[in-house]
Amino acid sequence: MVKETKRMIQAKKGIELECKGWEQEAVLRMLYNNLDPEVAEKPDELIVYGGIGKAARNWAAFEAIVEQLRTLEKDETLLIQSGKPVGRFKTHEQAPRVLLSNSVLVPKWAHWEHFNELEKQGLMMYGQMTAGSWIYIGSQGILQGTYETFAELARQHFGGSLKGTLTLTAGLGGMGGAQPLAVTMNGGVVIGVDVDRSRIEKRIATKYTDRITESLDQALAWASEAKAKGEPLSIGLVGNAAHLHHEILQRGVEVDVVTDQTSAHDPLNGYIPEGHSLEGAELLRKENPQRYMALAKQSMKKHVEAMLAFQRRGAIVFDYGNNIRQVAKDEGLEEAFAFPGFVPAYIRPLFCEGKGPFRWAALSGDPEDIYRTDRLIKELFPENEALIRWIDIAQEKVTFQGLPARICWLGYGERMKMGLEINRLVRNGELKAPIVIGRDHLDCGSVASPNRETEAMKDGSDAVGDWAILNALINTAAGGSWISVHHGGGVGMGYSLHAGMVVVADGTENAEKRLRRVLTTDPGMGIIRHADAGYELAKQVAREKGVMIPMEDKNEEGV
C-alpha cells in the first residue's frame, strides 16, 4: 500500500490554464476545489466529507490524476477506478473527458467488511457522492435541498414557518452542517449536536451556525429564550447524540422536530460510540475495529430509540438519509422505521417534475461571476417567487467555500435554459471564465437508494438499480464533461447506487450542443423513472414536456 504524504491543496483561480483546454482545466480545478481547506473536512487525508468520502485514493494517485489531466487532449477520455487513474483512450471531442467509477462492489460482496479489506490493500476508495466525483461545493451544496425540506415540513405541520419551534438534530459535518442555517432560514431554533468541536467551529466560521457550547444547560437556555421570542437561532452543542438526546428527553424539554445527519452510514469511520472522545475513538478504531463497530451500532440503536421517544411525545421526526434506521433495526429495534425518510415525506413531488439540486461554480474564482448568474436566474424565471427568494437568501447568508458557487433546484427545461444562457454569458465576455455545471447524486433520476431517495416507491421498485446506471449511460452518450457511477453514498455499502454528471459551459458551440443534450437527458431521467413507477404527476409532466415514454399506458398493468 502506498504511504500517505500530507499535503495542502487550494482551489486554483484566474484565467491562466494548466491544461490543454478549459474542459480539462475545469476537471482539475474542481478536483483541487474538493480538497481546498475551506471546502474539505480532512483535506490532508484526501477526505472531503461524509466519514471517509475521498477525492483520490492516495496522494500518489492524486498526483497521477493531476498529471494526466494536464496532458489530456480534447479528444481523449481518462478513466478513474475508485480514485486512481487506470486508463486513457482516444475518443472524440464531444465524449466525456473523464469517466469515474467509485466504490462499486459486486452485490454479494457489497458490505463494509469487504470494502474495508480492499481499502486496506489500497484497492478501493469510498467516493461518497460528490467527493469522488469532484463536484462538491461545501455545505451550500445541500443547503437549498435542506432548506426546501424544512420549508415543506413547515407548510405541512406549522402553518408555513418554523418560527417558535425547536428542532433537534445531530451531525454538523459537510452535509449535516447545512441543517442549522436551513432551520433558521425558515425562522426556527435548532440545536445541532456533534462530538467533534472543530466541525461546529467550521460551521460557525462559515456562518451556518450562530453559537457553540459544550453545556447542555446553556444550549437549552439559549433555545428556550429564542423560541419564546420567536427569533431564529442555531446552536452547536458539543457532545454525543446517543447520550444527549436521552438527557433532553429526561428533562421533559418540548422539542418540535427531530432528525439526524450523523455519519451513521459508516459504523467504523463515521459514528463515534457513546462515552468515547474523538481521541479514544480513534485509538479503539485502530486497535479493535470489530469492537468499535459493535459499540457504534449500539449507540445508533440508542440514538434511534430517543428519536422514537420524541415521536411518541408529539414531535415531527424524520430520517435524513444516513441509514441510521437500518442499523438500529439490524441491532434489534423492530420499530426503527416508524418514522419516515425525508424524500417520501417532503421531496418526491419535486422529483416527479424533474427538479433537483442544480449547481454551478465559477472557475475564475471571482464572486462577481456568481452574482451575475444570480441576476440571470431572476431574469429567466421572474415568476418563480420561491426561487427568487432562495437566491436573495443565499446572497445574504451563504459564505462561499473555495471556488464561488451557487445551487438552486431547477426542473426539466429550466436546467437546459439556464445552462445555455450561462454559456452565452461566457461567450459574450460577461463572465471572466467558464462555469462548471453539475449536481448532487441525490437527484430525481440518478439514484437507487431504498432507505433514502427511492424509499417507499409507489410500485415497490425501491431497490431497482437500473435507473442509476441508465442515467450515467445516457449522460455519457449526451456528452457530459465528466460522468461518475458510485456505490454506497449517503447510506453506506450495499444500500445505494448513484450517478453524477458535470458539464462545462465554456462559451463554445461544442459546449452549447452538450449543454442542450445533457441538461435534457439528466432531469428527463427523473421524470421517466417516476412515471414508470406510477406517479401521475410525473406522467402529466412527461406529456406536457414531450418526454417520450414508450410503454406509459402499459405500466399500470405491470408490464
Swiss-Prot record:
It is found in: Cytoplasm. It comes from the Bacteria. Binds 1 NAD(+) per subunit. Its EC number is 4.2.1.49. The active site is at 408. NAD(+) binds at residues 50-51, 128, 174-176, 194, 199, 240-241, 261-265, 271-272, 320, 490. It catalyses: 4-imidazolone-5-propanoate = trans-urocanate + H2O. Its cofactor is NAD(+). Pathway: Amino-acid degradation; L-histidine degradation into L-glutamate; N-formimidoyl-L-glutamate from L-histidine: step 2/3. GO terms for molecular function: urocanate hydratase activity. Keywords: Cytoplasm, Histidine metabolism, Lyase, NAD. It is an enzyme of class 4 (lyase). The keyword Cytoplasm applies. PROSITE patterns: UROCANASE. One of its GO terms (biological process) is L-histidine catabolic process to glutamate and formate. One of its GO terms (cellular component) is cytoplasm. Catalyzes the conversion of urocanate to 4-imidazolone-5-propionate. Belongs to the urocanase family. This is Urocanate hydratase. It comes from Halalkalibacterium halodurans (strain ATCC BAA-125 / DSM 18197 / FERM 7344 / JCM 9153 / C-125) (Bacillus halodurans). The gene is hutU.
